[in-house]
């Protein structure tokens, strides 16, 4: 099989889900995509286990079926991929590599790596605590692929790799040094694949060599992060040891005074695990508005005069603007700012609010795009010294490219 004709399967496993895409690397075309969900659930439940698949015909197929574990789910994916009518490969030998998205493996893996027995042992024994919600299901997905598609190279691609170029002054916390030395406590960041994709895309749009590009990438979705990029490399990012640090998000608190934890735990009579669940699942825009963490719904509520929804959106745009200003100071010179992710790509009024008041710094939003919620491209005026782009991010392409690079 030729290198450029390689088809790469991209896999992203959650605790009860498995998302997948098969990409033809010759033209970055998605041959099939879908997900298995409610893995491990009962067939008698209101929402029983199911697979969604979109393949040869382009028609979305949904089948309810027993999926007791990730292995069952992966077998269902393989069955559809090789199906006589809707399949996209005649045999699994056409798949040249499998790329797995890994949120954070701690200090043990700094870049994408081929799966070997030693790699699996290290990941299983040492990396799980650095993303305790995400890493166990990722491991289940890796093992399911190994059993179902033996002999096909598997590659772990880390959401933290793009941020490994951060200097020490950006990733260190002001904590006892032994926490860093012995436990790997430092800032790792997240959304690295998205930030990497938009950096490459911004270099193309700016017609500038990537190693000469200074930019600020704003990945804004239910989880959000902002990254400062100097000469094409990450030098700082808003998320930290976990994705809890940084911006106010859909249900995550973002930056806060750590002393609040003890104060609230004492008042509420809760333990640290309950507190962390609140910070991750019951904070952010959801907590501020008292209604929802979804920006689309918050915008509708604001139109209806909902004061807390308006306040939540104000807090969101203020925090983003504050990080943009900080990263302008970090970079010195900025060529462009990008907005990506569900919020960044489909909420122009929110994007505009993030840069309102920055005109003195040469950042001017083009108001002609304010009503266009499907626009992709430049959103700054010709007079704006710093260009702004809305870019549809594609993390799967980065995973596939990394898998292809290491499997060739």
Where are these regions (language model features)?
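Short glycine-rich, Thr/Ser-proximal phosphate-binding strand/loop in the N-terminal lobe
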Residues: 17-68
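Phosphate/pyrophosphate-binding loops at sites that engage ATP/ADP/AMP, CoA/4′-phosphopantetheine
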Residues: 80-96, 204-209, 324-335
